[in-house]
């Protein structure tokens, strides 16, 4: 089965980081945490999940920070989440199916649902697709100081309704 490196950038995320990292157990084979200057327990929590916790001086550039995180990943694929992201149990099963499928299909980029709007009950109500899982090949380069994105490359696949941002 392919290996997946979760690459995250964090700062002062002690309230949500443990929940996020707990939901990727079994899916991510490696966890990379890049801390940009936390003053709370974020790094302590990160170290309870991985020994691959790096300091990165904040340069007011999200793309530079994500590129640094991706440069530390060693898996076949690089997966990114924000600390407030949650993968629900039913979505986790879909991700595991996707991981098995990657052995045969090998897309360069897997687009996943990304919730950005919520109703009054906190349920996700507005989505778009983002590049969430990228083959580690040197072409997965983040651009954009704010609202960073990976420049399109290679062949794309769309994951079946995988992952809700900040829900749960």
Language-model region placement:
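Extreme N-terminal starter segment of soluble prokaryotic enzymes
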Residues: 1-5
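Conserved donor nucleotide-binding strand/loop of the catalytic core
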Residues: 44-68, 72
